[in-house]
Amino acid sequence: MGKKKKTEETAQPKKTSRSDVKERKELNKDTEFTCVKTSFNSLVENNYLSGGIQEIVLNINKICFLSYQLLNYHFTRLIEENKPLPEITQSLFYQACATVSVMKERKEKIDETDELYISFSHYKEHVGELPFRDRMGNLINNLNRQQLTMTENHLKLNFYKRFHKYLEIKTGETRKGVIYKWLKDIYAIEYSGKNFFILSMRQWLKYPPSEVNIKMHSSHFVKIYHKILKTFEKYPYSKHIRTFNLLPTKNSFTLSTIEICSSCLKDIIGYFTKTQVPDDFKENKLVYWYEFFKIEKYETKTRKFANTIYTDGKIAVIRLRKPKFEAPKPKDVKKTQYEQYVGIDPGVRSLQTSCNNEGRVLETTTPSYRNDCKMKYACRKREMWYKKWEHYEMWRNIPSFKTTNLQKMRDYFEYVYPNLNTIFQFHLYKNFRGLSFRSYCRGKATMDKLCKSIVDDKKTLVGFGDFSQQHGLVKKHPIAPIQKFKHELRRYCDVVIIDEYNTSKTCNKCFQPIELYKNKIIRKKRDGTHSKARMSIINSVIRCKLNECKLCCMDRDINASKNILFLLQLQKEGKKRPECFNPKNMNDCDTPLWEDKYVVA
């Protein structure tokens, strides 16, 4: 048969729904899911099965790594050659995974005219032995679903910040208030103004860059990202400008988890036995699950196994199903009597600084939390393993893949791909995954100890500052688990979110503005000598501007926690916040662009 002409009308196939999927969706309406994280060895006692799953995890991670980079190269090539981009769907990711893998047990047909295969052929000779996908179809489907989600999040969540920086570079405008006003007009559904710059940007973007539009027109916004990235590459030595990938990539060579569902279990059994799985697998799938995995000890009367396990060969996450309960009504804290009131100021340098109504102050610094969680130990261990590795110099000199230059991408492939198996094998046999699991276990214990020290076996009401931490707020500074801490604290006491406005800038004694403390500081140089004493500002210490105030100097975080405690007590009594803690309406800065700042995208 010849190919059908484009003019021929083809009947669209009717969309069918599987009975098991329909049944599962109905069941999910009345249930919710929870997870239990454990070591993989405690779940699987069969060494043959454990070793086989290790091999499968490694193979799927290779496919994930190669497919992500293929799509980045493919989209960049199509944009450079002015060819239309394919829609970003799960089928596209499956096609990419099929391109970078092979079938060992049967022959496969390869369409050498396909654009994706043409992109892969540009650097295929550097890859070496490709991973296999025999009896891996369902595992790859689960991987593709995750890849699609990661790509949508990558495009949606990063656009505002990168577009903000793009406007700053193109116009030279550094006032954030002005750029915010532009973005507000650019993001608006309808714009009735006559600002030439806003109109040109809206015309270039074509669609308002909301999350819904970015998801709906993802291929179009990849072109926008390409333009932004090309602009960023012109400033390689600017610290505040960071390059990025058009699409997400697997940034680490450490093995990631794979999702094993019932269909995947059927494939795994066929992979081990090299025979057809019995036809009664669907009816007896739970028998196979309980035979291969020790799941019974994690089930209870209400929590039952949900036919899914996530594993990277070192840890295992078991998904359990439980009945859906009605959400409890929010408690009226004004009518409840408490034994203790606590104000908590979360932050970056300190995970939390708390002060209760008796004046007891507790502070947990981020370095001390990371030390208790064995995170610092894990960092030192990883660094030691890398430095003792015989291929350390090769590893250290891996070039960047964050570029729009196709030749630089091919140079990356030529450098990395011949050593790909060596790198993955090193991360497989060294205990990188075990270090992460140890930090997770120690983190749970540390968080439990911290919450108990704050509550102190009393009925407690906590006022928690509404600090919304952004990743990268302080360059190269580790992030603090503020949201995790807040959710964990709700298990021990009642938590009320308090607006932090001006709590760090107002004296807790007289409610007057404060200023940063100044003093002479002697700094130690790298060569061991000391500099001359010089007047400097100490950011962590404040003093009240009012000379009559009793507050001489105090830690800035402790002052903020006392103000949060005061606002909590006012809210408990139903009183209004003082004027010094009320946000004032900022005047809109409608500064027009100068003529030399008119930029065509």
Q: How would you name each of these model-derived features?
A:
Residues 2-81, 87-97, 101-127, 132-150, ...:
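Positively charged, helix-rich recognition surfaces that bind polyanionic ligands
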